[in-house]
């Protein structure tokens, strides 16, 4: 909650200004391109059914029309992605410019930079202005766009998947059960389990990333100190002492790096398994209906696509976990 309050404190002057309508228009355009690309994805899911049914029926006459239709969908989706990315970069730079000017004024106004140098708080203001602000603007916009894309994708495909799931009847321990939309529940259960495991595996990443930024900044500050005081270091023959300080700070980076890479190794192992298992889950889930001939081959392919989209939506936290951790680490530094 404290992190969210700090982020809102940083974002409010830019997004809450009366003259920021251009930025809101940019954001609305980005969302518009995102929503239209989702609409095209729904069209492609319907195309999957027609294409694979025609393929299973060896219907060569339908293929040219279907291929041209698919190329049209792809052209529209690519256009949406490219335009959305271009507008996103413009918006990120506008926000970065606003934050940079604001932080520079706060840092230099009233000789505050001198007083901060004496007290040592906060650490490395140069990094906060030059790097952290850009990372904050970029990661915030990227995550927001990803979240909107996820909500739209879920809203578009959950109804399709529910309808394709039909009504399933099964018996367990002598009791009969009826399940509607069972593929939706399979996607939810798989994503919930994956999200819990992702959090358990990567829960230390945030603190390690924050610590990494501090240690990297301390090392850069020590290097700058040697450069700025090169004459004194040479005159007093302090090269050995400075070398010792630099090595000490670099050893702190190395210690953090070891712990961070160990944590990332566990996270990446989980992620690699998660991605590959996710490919087979929709096939396995729809296989009984296909073998029972309640689904055509085209239905199975459309179900596979819809299942993947819904499962992606449920698993947004898992997919975005590392980006969320990196965003939290960056948002915790400026202030």
Where are these regions (language model features)?
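Membrane-integrated ABC transporters
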Residues: 1-41, 46, 50-70, 84-88, ...
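Hydrophobic/aromatic residues in alpha-helical transmembrane segments
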Residues: 7, 44-48, 84, 103, ...
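A hydrophobic transmembrane-helix motif
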Residues: 29-32, 36, 76, 80, ...
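Membrane-spanning helices that line or support transport/gating and their immediate boundary helices
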Residues: 47-54, 86-94, 98, 102, ...
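Loop segments that connect adjacent transmembrane helices in multi-pass transporters
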Residues: 204, 208-261
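Cytosolic ends of transmembrane helices, especially the final helix of ABC transmembrane type-1 domains
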Residues: 206, 217, 234-238, 244, ...
């Amino acid at each position: 909650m404290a992190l969210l309050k700090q982020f809102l404190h940083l974002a409010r002057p830019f997004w809450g200004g009366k003259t920021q309508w251009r930025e809101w228009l940019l954001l609305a355009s980005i969302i518009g391109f995102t929503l239209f690309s989702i609409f095209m994805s729904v069209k492609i899911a319907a195309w999957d059914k027609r294409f694979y049914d025609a393929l299973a029926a060896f219907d060569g006459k339908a293929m040219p029309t279907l291929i041209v239709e698919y190329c049209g969908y792809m052209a529209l989706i690519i256009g949406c992605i490219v335009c959305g990315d271009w507008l996103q970069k413009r918006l990120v730079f506008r926000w970065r410019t606003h934050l940079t000017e604001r932080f520079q004024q706060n840092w230099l106004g009233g000789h505050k930079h001198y007083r901060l140098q004496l007290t040592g708080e906060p650490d490395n203001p140069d990094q906060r202005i030059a790097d952290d602000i850009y990372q904050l603007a970029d990661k915030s916009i990227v995550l927001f766009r990803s979240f909107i894309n996820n909500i739209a994708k879920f809203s578009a495909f959950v109804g399709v998947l529910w309808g394709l799931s039909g009504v399933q009847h099964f018996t367990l321990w002598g009791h009969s059960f009826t399940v509607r939309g069972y593929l939706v529940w399979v996607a939810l259960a798989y994503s919930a389990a994956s999200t819990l495991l992702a959090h358990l595996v990567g829960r230390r990443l945030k603190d390690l990333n924050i610590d990494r930024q501090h240690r990297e900044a301390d090392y850069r500050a020590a290097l700058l100190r040697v450069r700025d005081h090169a004459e004194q270091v040479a005159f007093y023959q302090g090269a050995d002492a400075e070398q010792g300080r630099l090595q000490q700070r670099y050893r702190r980076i190395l210690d953090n790096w070891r712990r961070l890479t160990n944590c990332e190794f566990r996270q990446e192992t989980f992620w690699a398994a998660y991605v590959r298992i996710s490919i087979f889950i929709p096939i396995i889930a729809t296989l009984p209906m296909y073998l029972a001939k309640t689904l055509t081959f085209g239905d199975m392919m459309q179900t596979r696509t819809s299942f993947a989209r819904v499962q992606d939506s449920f698993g947004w936290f898992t997919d975005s976990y590392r980006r969320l951790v990196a965003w939290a680490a960056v948002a915790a530094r400026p202030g």
